[in-house]
Amino acid sequence: MIIKRREYMRIADYSVTKAVLDRHGFTFKKSFGQNFLTDTNILQKIVDTAEIDQNVNVIEIGPGIGALTEFLAENAAEVMAFEIDDRLVPILADTLRDFDNVQVVNQDILKADLQTQIKQFKNPDLPIKVVANLPYYITTPILMHLIESKIPFQEFVVMMQREVADRISAEPNTKAYGSLSIAVQYYMTAKVAFIVPRTVFVPAPNVDSAILKMVRRDQPLIEVKDEDFFFRVSRLSFVHRRKTLWNNLTSHFGKSEDIKTKLEKGLALADIKPSIRGEALSIQDFGKLADALKEVGL
């Protein structure tokens, strides 16, 4: 396996990126949300943040022309890169020809049989980290698909729209806090590592990006009686952010006297005021609320 760092120009150097795209006659597709990073310092920082070494396998999503893949391959045991755009497969074969520890899988990550795919690693027992520059338009579905999968991904270091990274890592009583924060933080710790300006991409997106580091918890943050119901309660509590918890709950469950009586009992059991807003409740509070509402028959 070749792990020596390249001494010549990087794929991410702007002149190299442009030459590769021109040589292959590549044009960007908006439908794939393609923005290629052209800053080698940021790429190195991503690898450092992910703490990639020879004892780690990496799954990359959306390798593009291989700018990040190059850095990952120099450090990881193996890299499995999922690329949905079949036009990029021959380009990746060209740009990554010096590496024998990279597998390019021409498939949508949401449709891939990951349990089968990870067995293709030479050493599938090594910890697996996900490192990716995620397309803005499908960031959340990809993340939740991977987080909720049965595969014990140890860590995620992913680039995404800054606003989404802020929402995922947000704490209660902040504007960004919501059901997405809860859905991710139930399983993972989440912290914004650093900001990536829009100016370092080709083509430049309309907003800045952020690198979000997420580490899987040994166990979910809290224990709840019914996970699906817990996530349902957290989601419906933010449907109308400026409305009280009571208004959101009655909008969802109904306003009959029987329902309102059960809601009152559940809120009292969880020791939560009906007049509070969802953004003021911690994940632990939502766990207590969901369990209490379940207990009273909702």
UniProtKB/Swiss-Prot annotation:
GO terms for molecular function: 16S rRNA (adenine(1518)-N(6)/adenine(1519)-N(6))-dimethyltransferase activity; RNA binding. It catalyses: adenosine(1518)/adenosine(1519) in 16S rRNA + 4 S-adenosyl-L-methionine = N(6)-dimethyladenosine(1518)/N(6)-dimethyladenosine(1519) in 16S rRNA + 4 S-adenosyl-L-homocysteine + 4 H(+). Gene3D superfamilies: Ribosomal RNA adenine dimethylase-like, domain 2, Vaccinia Virus protein VP39. It is found in: Cytoplasm. S-adenosyl-L-methionine binds at N35, L37, G62, E83, D108, N133. PROSITE patterns: RRNA_A_DIMETH, SAM_RNA_A_N6_MT. Belongs to the class I-like SAM-binding methyltransferase superfamily. rRNA adenine N(6)-methyltransferase family. RsmA subfamily. Specifically dimethylates two adjacent adenosines (A1518 and A1519) in the loop of a conserved hairpin near the 3'-end of 16S rRNA in the 30S particle. May play a critical role in biogenesis of 30S subunits. This is Ribosomal RNA small subunit methyltransferase A.
